[in-house]
UniProtKB/Swiss-Prot annotation:
GO MF terms, alphabetically ordered: folic acid binding
Protein name: tRNA-modifying protein YgfZ
Subcellular location: Cytoplasm
Organism: Edwardsiella ictaluri (strain 93-146)
SUPFAM superfamilies linked to this entry: Aminomethyltransferase beta-barrel domain (SSF101790), Folate-binding domain (SSF103025)
Entry-linked Gene3D superfamilies: 2.40.30.160, 3.30.70.1630, Aminomethyltransferase beta-barrel domains
Keyword line: Cytoplasm, Folate-binding, tRNA processing
């Protein structure tokens, strides 16, 4: 069966209303890094501390330029004989080009895994449905599990959900066939909406090379090591922590809008009877009920009762929603 055919676009649902849902995550791409120098090379490029990454863990992290600005946020794990990271497909070509710049001096191969299939499973009874296909599932204590030709990643927010990296289409079909009989089918938009609810930073091409990792909450999410030593952009990232150079943070907004803003657009903040341009949109989704979810980078000291709107949209109203984690800047 052609796995693309059933995954037709449809408006996303909020996590609290989501039935068992199977998604094909074509808007994300896995990149494999292998070779004798894979770990040491990535250690000098990414914000995470790779030697401390256990085989049962996955982590968010960032890849920065020399000024500490993010080429992309990544989800990193050990896979096969090296590492795999997941990122938004729109930024993959540019990010890989930057990552490969100095790889000529290392025994490390960096290739996109176009043969792999990424699936998402979320919603009511997601654990029970996957448990019928796998003898064990990842959980909060060990959120990464290899099961044959699949790697299963557990994510707790906004409700327990799973991302599956299937080695090939045959493995994806093995999972798809039984699940599709009982699950709602959706495309990447549903997973993106869940990431917005979760406060997981979504860096697409228009926002590439724009933000320090702290500005998209990577420090609050445990995605930055300040003890690992040098990596690309490390000095500027450390300065943002120790000198308070960063005054921005990632927020989840929801409300109404006549139109969806594009990534990199600014919003408008209500100040009395007037509006002032503020912040940068990272991602936006319109839900099935007509409401809007936005992820945006705004001033970190923005009052919790602030009201914003989509630029030049007089009928729009957006308010801040709490994230499922503390935004205190911890390592």
């Amino acid at each position: 069966m052609n796995l693309n055919a059933p995954f037709s676009p449809q408006p996303p649902l909020a996590a609290e209303h989501l039935p068992l849902t199977l998604m094909r995550l074509d808007d994300w791409l896995p990149i494999n890094v292998s070779g004798p120098d894979a770990q040491s090379y990535l250690q000098g490029q990414l914000t995470a501390d790779l030697p401390s990454l256990a085989a049962t863990q996955h982590t968010l992290c960032g890849h920065c330029d020399a000024q500490g600005k993010l080429w992309s946020s990544l989800r990193l794990l050990r896979r096969r004989d090296g590492f795999t990271y997941l990122l938004r497909r729109s930024v993959a070509t540019l990010q890989m080009l930057e990552l490969k710049k100095y790889a000529v001096f290392a025994k490390a191969s960096i290739v996109s895994d176009e043969g792999a299939v990424l699936l998402g499973v979320a919603g009511a009874q997601a654990s029970e449905a996957l448990g019928a296909l796998f003898p064990r599932l990842p959980d909060a204590d060990a959120p990464l599990l290899q099961a044959g030709r699949s790697h299963l990643l557990y994510m707790a927010w906004p409700q327990p959900r799973y991302l599956l990296i299937c080695d090939d289409a045959d493995e994806a079909e093995r999972i798809f066939a039984p699940l599709s009989a009982r699950a709602r089918l959706a495309d990447s938009a549903q997973w993106l909406a869940l990431d917005i609810e979760s406060g997981i930073p979504l860096i697409d091409e228009p926002n590439c090379d724009s933000f320090l990792p702290q500005a998209v909450n990577l420090q609050a999410l445990g995605g930055i090591s300040f003890t690992k030593g040098c990596y690309s952009g490390q000095e500027m990232v450390a300065r943002a922590k120790y000198r308070g150079a960063n005054r921005r943070a990632l927020f989840w907004l929801r409300g109404s809008a006549e139109r969806l803003p594009h990534a990199s657009e600014d919003l408008e903040l209500r100040l009395g009877d007037s509006w002032r341009r503020s912040g940068t949109v990272l991602a936006a989704q319109r839900l099935a009920d007509g409401g809007v979810y936005l992820q945006a980078v705004l001033s970190s000291d923005l009052p919790a009762d602030s009201v914003l709107r989509v630029r030049d949209d007089a009928r729009s109203q957006l308010t801040l929603s709490p994230l499922p984690y503390s935004t205190d800047q911890q390592e």
